[in-house]
Amino acid sequence: KGYGCPGLSYIAYGLICQELERGDSGVRSFASVQGSLAMYPIWDFGSEEQKNHYLPRMATGELIGCFGLTEPDYGSNPGDMITRAEDKGDHYLLNGAKMWITNGTIADLAVVWAKLDGVIRGFIVEKDDPGFSAPEMTGKHSLKASVTSELVFQDCKIPKDRILPGVKGLKGPFSCLNNARFGISWGAVGAAQSCFNSTKEYALSRIQFGHPIASFQLVQNKLSWMLREITKAQLLAYHLGKKKDDGTWIPEHISLAKMNNVEIGRAH
C-alpha cells in the first residue's frame, strides 16, 4: 500500500493471478516476480529512500524487477549460497551467479541475496551496474512467454545505499517466496479452469454416433470430476486469501495450498 500501489486485498491479488494464468502461465509468472519477489522486499525491508525511488515506477511497469536467490548448485538449500558481497568502504563488491531467474534479461533491477560477512543480505542491483550481466537461457519446453535468465556478478560494484537494511538471514527471501507461492496457488486454478473450458467445448463439438460426446455419461462423469476438483482448489485458495488478509496465516498454509492446487492444474 502506498508508493503508487493500490493496496488491494490478498484475495484481489489472488484473483488477478488466477485470471492471468487462465490466459498464460508465463504472464502470471512475470506478475508474481514483479510484485512478490521484487517489489515486496523493497516495500517490507527497504529504506524510505529505496521505496520512494523504485516502487512508484515498478508499480506502473516503468521499471521491471527480478529476484536472485537460486544458484547452479544451491536451489533447495539456499543457506549454502556461494554468492558473496564484500564491504569496500564506500561500496560493496558482489561476486557469484544466480540461475533460472524469471525476468532477468529484461529487468531494470534485481533484488539479489548474497552473503556479507557470512550473513545473507539483500541488495538492489541495477542493470547498468559495472560487473553485472544477465544472459537469457534458451531452449525451454514450456513457459516460453516468460524470460528466464542467469545473473552473473563479476566484481559488481554496488553503492552502499542499495543494501536492504530491514532484514538479515533467510527470513528475507523466504518471506518473498511465501507471497509468490500464494499467487501460484491461485494461478494454478486459472490454468485448470482454462483446461476445463477447452475440454467442455471439445466435448460439445465432437460428434460420435450422431451425438456430441458430452451427451455420454462417461464424459459427463469426467467433466464433473474435473469441475469438482477445480472448485475445491479455488475454495482452498479463497480460504487462504482470507487468512492472509486477516493475518492468521502461517507458511505451512501457503505450501499446502500450492502443493494441492498445482497438482490439480497438472492433472487437468
Stretch-by-stretch model annotation:
Residues 1-33, 45-50, 57-62, 77-78, ...:
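Alpha-helical interface subdomain recognition
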Residues 36-44:
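Helix-loop "lid/cap" segments that line or gate small-molecule binding pockets
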Residues 44-46, 86, 112-115, 124-127, ...:
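Short beta-strand-to-turn element immediately C-terminal to the catalytic PLP-Schiff-base lysine
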Residues 61-69:
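A short, Trp-centered hydrophobic/proline-enriched beta-strand micro-motif
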Residues 73-82:
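Active-site-adjacent elements of ketosynthase-type condensing enzymes
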Residues 80, 128-160:
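Flexible, small-/acidic-enriched active-site or ligand-binding loops
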Residues 91, 95-134:
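A short core secondary-structure module
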Residues 99-105, 142-143, 179-183:
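Glycine-rich phosphate/pyrophosphate-binding beta-alpha loops
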